[in-house]
Every structure is written in structure tokens, then in C-alpha cells.
Regions:
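Conserved AMP-binding/adenylate-forming core of the ANL superfamily
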Residues: 28-30, 39, 47-92, 96-100, ...
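Structural core segment of the AMP-binding/adenylate-forming
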Residues: 1-6, 72, 76-77, 100, ...
């Protein structure tokens, strides 16, 4: 354990103070934007590696030069400040150079999800009305599936690879000067100008484009730099998508603004993770909770005890994974946090309390007005009292987390920048909450807060279903299921059953070889009440995730438990024999016909 890590663990207060000190000038609008700051970083850190992957490395000087060239490319195309360019590229050092350069010229860059194709990709392009779409050569076949659904006025430009008839931006910039831009040549964008569109994950419905200002980019970068105490000696391992705020801004920006290096990987590999960490001498790792579970499921590897990681930072680390992950791999510090790209507030667990997503120190309470309000699952809305106002939750009572928006009724609050679609932005705002005229951002997440002020994630709104007259939390059921012997991963959701009120619980399981279904049920009987125990079980080889490692439970729920539609092994709980039995077509017909009671 390094002295710096030990200091962080002993005094979370120091982490908060560092974060406040680094972001104070940004709040006063006394700093440049990140693409402008890159030039100053290049002067200071020069040949030090900024971004690297398996084949390419960009020093700070080389990164700044490319930023200048991409900015000049934007000017050469007569792209005006506020116009949009979409970016459709896999993780690589040039990804950052492209969007930093274009935003240096005042262009807004929309970071497209590289898992999308066809009409879904076209939707993401069309909702931001771009002039150009920059496509990596390796992704051109995927991009062409959307082109017929995009207006002909939108120009496609290739980056690398076989471009066919398309111009290649990476060869065009070679002819452009790499020297520092002057204010006359290219006026710098303001902090409050929009820099990026970052899309919601699309776990339900089509993605929405969230507005991300230069101010937000700088705040995220410097706030996390303070909490993680990043230094020039740090090397961040970033295998999360660069099109998302966590992988693309937090993991990269927090290290770059302090002179460290970012080791990029196109995708996460549980098998290659520890050898990679050791070989690249990484000190930091940006995680999504599911990645930690995948690592725990791997057999022991010699490199898992040879690493030099001092801190892992991320979100979504489940309570049942936290301590086994930290203990097995000897992780000195875990910085778990809660945030949303478009959200008005964030929570941080600087103390490393297992299972908690964060807390708000008393000295910051006035800056971060957050509340948990009683929520009506049936109506899908917060509960209102006789005066029409929302009701705060008691200690350890689950409710929807909301954050007050700045400027509302003269109160302090967080900045809510919303989406490209104004109507979508309005849907996220809850009005007349505790006083007439106030406005709060709706997270859509149910949380509880304990007596010490720690927040705990409970469920997504809509992930609670009703069965046998009782409300069932998918989060609580998932926590019970994933601790059962032989279960590697699980998704829990509700499914409709003809003739039954509410929705029955169903669990999709990834299991180890030799999984004992009877023993699984016995464990659930001990841990869950009858109404919360999954009625249906589906054994799957893997769980499909979004590009940001969120479960696609909506697709599983739509597929349901019909053996003619689902090829995986399906089981239904037979209360008479007290066992999960195979659900075949004959049993399904009896169930649908009302002859098989649940």
C-alpha cells in the first residue's frame, strides 16, 4: 500500500478538500476549457505518454498537436460553433484527439454508441442533426446499415482503414498545421458552451442525447482528479467505452489534467485483465460493477497478486461482490460513486463503506440538495400529500432520489443540462416538490439512506413489480440469487401470467457447470419470502449487456417463458412438489390455459 493511498483512506476529508480546491476556479469561470487546457498540459508534460493502446501512443505534445489539426480541419470545413459532428469509432487514442480538436473549434461532438446499427444508429444520428459523421474504417459496414435512414445532406467521413470513396480525415489533417491556435484564427469556446452529446444507454427504448457542456467536462475531470489524487506517475486502465461519460470523460480527464497516462483497451477481457494491468504498470482502474463480478468468476491467476493498483473507481459494485473483490485481489481503496450523465447531483463513497453508493458530508449539504421521496409503484410517481407536495422518506425507507435544480425558486441546487430534446428534458423534472415553484431532477432510481447518511441503491423505478399482493424489488431478489452456490450472474424481472394479477418473478441465470437447481431453491427458501422467490428460471450462457454493461432486462422480459420462443432451459416452480421443474410446451399450454396454478 502506498503512502498516498493510506493517506486517502485515513482522511476522506482530504479527498473532498482536494476536489473542492480543483473545481473552485471552474465554478468561478476562471479556467479554460479542456481542449484549450491540453496545450498548457503539453507545455508542461511534453513527451510524457498521455494516451496509449496496444499499437499507438500519444504523448502530451502529440495529443496537443492533433487537437490543433482537428480544430483546423473543422475550420476548413466551415463548421460553425454550435454545429454538430457525430463520432462513430472504437476506443483508441485518436478518439480523444478528434473530439477535443473539434470542440476546440466550437463544434459539438455527438459520441455514438458503436454497438448500434441500422435504424437505432440512424435515430441517434438524426436527433442531433449533424453536418458530418466520422466513422472508423473498421465500422464502415455497420455505419452503412444506417445510411439509408439518414438525410442525404449528412456527410460521412472515414478515419483509418479501407475508406472506399470516402475522404479520410486522419490523412487530411496531416496537411494542416499542428502549431498552437491563435484567438483570431480560432476563438476558444466558453465553459458554458455545449461540448458533447452523450447518449443514455438505451436499456429501455431508444437512446436520448444528453447535453454536456465544457463546464461539465472540466468539473468531472477535476473533481475526480481530486478524489483520486491523481498524479503524473498514475496510469489509468480504461476498458470502458469512450462514447460514455465514465470511460470517455471521467477515466480519461481525471488523469490527463494531472499529467498521468491513460491505457486504453477496446473491450474488457476478464482473461487478459491481470496480465494487462501488470504489464502496463497501472495504478488506477475505472470499473463498472459487472466487471468486478466477472473477475471474481475467473480462476486464480498469478498476476492478480502482482499488480500495483492503488485505487479502483467506478459505480454499480454490488454489496455481495465488494468485499470478496477487494479481499481476493488486495485492492487498497475502492471509490464507489453514483452519477448520471445528465444528472444534477452525484454521490461519493470516499470512506470505502462496502455496499454504499455515497454520502453527502454535512459541509456540502447546502451545495447538494438531495432528497428521497415516497414513491407509488402502481402509479409510477412520487406520493403527494393533501397539499399536493412530496413526502420525504424516513431513515432506511426506500424512495426515489431527486436533486434540486439550480435557479429554482431562488434555491441552491445542481446544474441540469437536459437533453437535445426539450420534451425529454421536461419529463425528468419534478415540480412543486416541497414548495410551489421548486424544481427537482428525477433520477428514476430508488434508494434508501441510513442513520449515518450513507445512500444505498435499491432499484430502478419500474424494476419493482407486484406479485401475490406484495411489492417485490428486483434488486433485493438479485442480491439473494447471486449469492447462491453455482450462480455466476443473474437478471431478475417480472413477467405477466394470464389470469394472474401483477407480474411473476423470473430469473435469468448464468451458472457454473454442475449447478444444482434443487439446492438453489433450498437457498432461496431460506433467504426470500414465498412471493419474492422467482416463479420462473431461465438458464442462459451469458447475459446480454448494453455498451455500458447494463443488463438488457427489457428484452428478457419480452421473451418471457414461452418454450417455443426461448431456446434456453426454462423451469417453473411447482409449489406442489416444492421444486423447479422443466417447462416444456405441454406445461406452457396448461399454464396459459389456466390449468397450472402458480
Amino acid at each position: 500500500m502506498t503512502a498516498r493511498t493510506d493517506e486517502n483512506m485515513k482522511s476522506p476529508l482530504q479527498a473532498w478538500v482536494r476536489a473542492l480546491e480543483l473545481t473552485a476556479p471552474i465554478e468561478r469561470r476562471a479556467t479554460p476549457t479542456l481542449p484549450v487546457l491540453i496545450e498548457a498540459l503539453a507545455e508542461r508534460f511534453g513527451a510524457a505518454p498521455a494516451l496509449l493502446d496496444r499499437v499507438t501512443s500519444l504523448s502530451y505534445r502529440e495529443l496537443a498537436d492533433k487537437v490543433n489539426q482537428y480544430a483546423r480541419w473543422a475550420r476548413a470545413q466551415a463548421l460553425a460553433p454550435g454545429e454538430v459532428v457525430c463520432l462513430y469509432m472504437p476506443n483508441c487514442p485518436d478518439y480523444l484527439a478528434v473530439w477535443l480538436g473539434l470542440t476546440r473549434a466550437g463544434v459539438i461532438v455527438a459520441l455514438l454508441n458503436t454497438n448500434l446499427t441500422g435504424t437505432a444508429l440512424a435515430h441517434s444520428i438524426n436527433i442531433v442533426s449533424p453536418r458530418y459523421v466520422i466513422v472508423a474504417g473498421v465500422l464502415l459496414p455497420a455505419a452503412w446499415t444506417a445510411r439509408a435512414h439518414v438525410p442525404g445532406s449528412v456527410r460521412f467521413v472515414a478515419h483509418g482503414g479501407e475508406a472506399g470513396d470516402l475522404p479520410r480525415i486522419d490523412t487530411q489533417i496531416v496537411e494542416l498545421a499542428a502549431t498552437q491556435l491563435t484567438a483570431d484564427e480560432c476563438p476558444a469556446p466558453a465553459l458554458d458552451d455545449r461540448a458533447l452529446y452523450i447518449y443514455t444507454s438505451g436499456t429501455t427504448g431508444l437512446p436520448k442525447a444528453a447535453n454536456v457542456s465544457h463546464l461539465r467536462v472540466m468539473q468531472w475531470s477535476h473533481w475526480f482528479a481530486g478524489l483520486m489524487n491523481t498524479q503524473p506517475s498514475d496510469r489509468m486502465y480504461d476498458c470502458l467505452p469512450l462514447y460514455h461519460s465514465v470511460g470517455g470523460v471521467v477515466a480519461t480527464g481525471a488523469v490527463l489534467v494531472r499529467g498521468g497516462s491513460v491505457v486504453l483497451r477496446e473491450k474488457f477481457s476478464a482473461r487478459e485483465f491481470w496480465p494487462d494491468i501488470v504489464q502496463e504498470r497501472c495504478s488506477l482502474f475505472q470499473y463498472i460493477g459487472e466487471l468486478c463480478r466477472y473477475l471474481l468468476a475467473q480462476p486464480p491467476h498469478p498476476d492478480e497478486s502482482r499488480h500495483t493498483l492503488r485505487l479502483c473507481c467506478g459505480n454499480g459494485l454490488r454489496p455481495d461482490v465488494w468485499e470478496p473483490f477487494q479481499q481476493r485481489f488486495h485492492i487498497p481503496q475502492i471509490l464507489e460513486y453514483y452519477a448520471a450523465t445528465e444528472g444534477s447531483f452525484s454521490l461519493y463513497n470516499c470512506e470505502g463503506k462496502p455496499g454504499a453508493i455515497g454520502r453527502i458530508p454535512p459541509f456540502l449539504a447546502h451545495r447538494t440538495p438531495v432528497a428521497l421521496v415516497k414513491f407509488d409503484d402502481a402509479q409510477g410517481q412520487p406520493v403527494r400529500d393533501e397539499a399536493g407536495l412530496c413526502i420525504r422518506c424516513a431513515v432506511n425507507e426506500a424512495g426515489e432520489a431527486i436533486g434540486q435544480i439550480s435557479g429554482a425558486a431562488g434555491k441552491h441546487g445542481g446544474r441540469f443540462e437536459g437533453y437535445a430534446d426539450a420534451a425529454a428534458s421536461e419529463k425528468k423534472i419534478l415540480r412543486d416538490v416541497f414548495a410551489k415553484g421548486d424544481a427537482w431532477y428525477r433520477t428514476g432510481d430508488l434508494m434508501r439512506k441510513d442513520a449515518q447518511g450513507y445512500f444505498y441503491f435499491v432499484d430502478r423505478v419500474g424494476d419493482t413489480y407486484r406479485w401475490k399482493g406484495e411489492n417485490v424489488s428486483t434488486g433485493e431478489v438479485t442480491a439473494a440469487v447471486t449469492t447462491c452456490a453455482g450462480v455466476v450472474d443473474a437478471a431478475v424481472y417480472g413477467v405477466s401470467v394470464p389470469g394472474a394479477d401483477g407480474r411473476a418473478g423470473m430469473a435469468a441465470l448464468v451458472v457454473e457447470s454442475g449447478f444444482d437447481l434443487a439446492a438453489f431453491r433450498r437457498e432461496l427458501v431460506e433467504r426470500l419470502p414465498d412471493y419474492a422467490r422467482p416463479v420462473f428460471v431461465r438458464v442462459v450462457p451469458t447475459l446480454e449487456l448494453t455498451g455500458t454493461f447494463k443488463l438488457r432486462k427489457q428484452d428478457l422480459a419480452l421473451e418471457g417463458y414461452d418454450p417455443t420462443r426461448v431456446r434456453d432451459a426454462l423451469y417453473v416452480e411447482d409449489r406442489r412438489t416444492e421444486a423447479y421443474v422443466r417447462l416444456e410446451e405441454s406445461g406452457y399450454a396448461r399454464l396459459i390455459g389456466g390449468q397450472l396454478r402458480l
